[in-house]
A protein has these predicted regions:
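Membrane-proximal linker segments that couple transmembrane helices to downstream signaling/catalytic modules
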Residues: 2-96
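Cytosolic nucleotide-binding catalytic cores of signal-transduction proteins
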Residues: 56-148
């Protein structure tokens, strides 16, 4: 249902050249709900315990790269659909952008994200800043937990 709605809105957005904030205002809550449900499912899987263990390491050099990639693969498996939705809705978002959003949403620490994405923490800070420009504030805040 959400995918059909997104496809319709994306079509009308492309035809009318309406700003993303406007065209997507009515489905932002549905996207956020889809994120929440996926997180609920992810948390119930064994891979989530692995994520929690890896998050305890506060030094990115001590994080096992293979384990970090395995957890990231688990995130990809769980959030593929919602990541695809975000890319359809917000055309400026890259695959890595939406994957980073999903990883942060499920609880990746800065250090773990740095290892999993093979990027410095500084590069990830810049990515987050670029993502903030691309997403409506309600979705950005829901993903990054900037508003309670």
């Amino acid at each position: 249902k959400l995918n059909l709605k997104i496809a319709r809105l994306t079509e009308s957005h492309n035809e009318n050249n309406t700003p993303a904030d406007e065209i997507n205002a009515d489905i932002q809550s549905e996207v956020i709900e889809k994120l929440r449900l996926n997180k609920e499912l992810f948390v119930s899987q064994p891979i989530y315990n692995r994520l929690k263990q890896l998050n305890l390491k506060r030094d990115s050099d001590s994080v096992d790269r293979t384990a970090a990639k395995e957890v990231l693969d688990g995130v990809i498996g769980q959030f593929a659909d919602v990541c695809s939705n975000l890319r359809q809705l917000y055309v400026g978002m890259t695959y890595d952008d939406v994957l980073y959003c999903a990883a942060i949403y499920v609880g990746f620490s800065k250090e773990l994200a740095s290892v999993a994405f093979g990027s410095s923490e500084d590069a990830l800070r810049r990515r987050k800043s670029r993502i903030k420009q691309k997403l409506p504030s309600t979705i950005f805040d829901a993903i990054f937990g900037t508003k309670v």
